[in-house]
């Protein structure tokens, strides 16, 4: 019986270590910083969506670097968050559709 208790504890410990390493791998799998992918996150408010506005275009503000964005008030360090002009096209009020009851 003593052997089974030790093996169950060992198995649980190994499973927890495995989960820990998977979490670490997922946390740091963002890729290299020098890749050419430009990810821009834009926050569009819920009110804009409910008013029927749609995202029309994104334009970077003052792109001065060939491989990225650099602004006059910043040094040459890597810019993580990039500002963009967001142009919303207004399609008018959304029409209210009453729920369909079966």
UniProtKB/Swiss-Prot annotation:
The modification Sulfotyrosine is found at residue 91. Residues 56-78 are annotated as: Disordered. 'Golven' means irregular waves in Dutch. The keyword Secreted applies. The modification Hydroxyproline is found at residue 99. This is Protein GOLVEN 4. Belongs to the RGF family. Keywords: Differentiation, Growth factor, Hydroxylation, Secreted, Signal, Sulfation.
